Amino acid sequence: MLFYLEEVFHMSVSYIEINRSALRHNLRVIRSHLPAHVDCTAVVKADAYGHGASETMRIALEEGYNSAAVARVEEGVALRKDGFTCPVFTLGLPLPEEAETAVKYDLIVPVDDTVELEPFEEAAESQGKILEVWLPIDTGMNRIGTHPEDVEGFLEKLKKYPHIHIHGTFTHMAKADIHDKTTARKQLEKFEEALSHMPQRLEKGFIISAANSAGVLDMPESWYNLARPGIILYGPHPSDEMDNMWDLEYPMRLISHITHVQVLRKGEAIGYGGTYVAEEDMRTATIPIGYADGFHRALSNKGSVLVNGKRHRIIGRICMDQMMITAGDDVQVGDEVVLLGRQGDEVIYPEEIAAIVNTIPHEVMCGLKRVPRIYVDE
């Protein structure tokens, strides 16, 4: 469960600070690079990559985005319960058990030729509604979707379900985030093949979407009429191989405070397994945050944090709820610690953490689930 109550700030020594102004800046920059005929959906799956789906969506709608995209039905339901009436697309295939809910909350769900359609038809009919769906096309990601050569047959099958309406179609590019766009362009060629079998493509309002963050940045031919920016909403670029790097900001800061300072004597070990041994007498400090909060254990003896605008090394193994760092004479109990983001002139970017633990910044931000959030405007 994630928390977004201002009161939590007064109860927790560790929290995530989300800068609304930085979020708004990114949303505005991305929207400004796209022509007016290309709509933007804000990808707010995984609670907006840890930034808070509802707050991100509120700002996105103010900045000209027309819809939300989430991974699962329950994420779409959460947006509806928070009062959002804009179109909400889900990106993952729904199960038959989710049919009633998808219809009830007016979600636009993906269906391909592997989905059992009868439960969705029955749910829509029983509720007196038309279920809007969009068709995922597998152009090479090999995750979900109908293959281009099977589209015509699938469309014929869909005619048997009068309470299911095709709202649009989409595909996902697997290698648009590298310099060589050959594979991405081949995927778009396959998408065009699939589109050629869809007479609906000529209808007003029919959604055609292929541009993920990498496509938004580097491939105007992928924009069609709906762009799906995801990671770039939150600061990081898809990779360091992008041809275009925009002026994006990082809204997220992970903050904690020093709870303990001590002197570690020469020859003494610290933490589980004693993986760090002091070569001389030294001051160390303890921070009440650990891998249960989503801070990677692989940063043990490798990562850094910021205290008083200076970098301090993580020493010993990161524990479930606590971790230890080197501490200079100026480090005191109660001092602010920044584990992700800016403090003074120093910054720890999610890309830095991702490089150390051999992952991507998406996972770094999405994994911080236990820590409460607060919002600021700066």
Task: Annotate each language-model stretch with its function.
Residues 33:
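Conserved PLP-enzyme active-site core in the AAT-like
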Residues 14-17, 24, 38-209:
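Active-site-proximal beta-alpha core segment in soluble small-molecule metabolic enzymes
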Residues 2-5, 9-20, 24, 75, ...:
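Active-site anion/phosphate-binding pocket segments in diverse small-molecule metabolic enzymes
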Residues 28, 156, 362:
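Active-site phosphate/pyrophosphate- and oxyanion-stabilizing loops and adjacent acidic/basic residues
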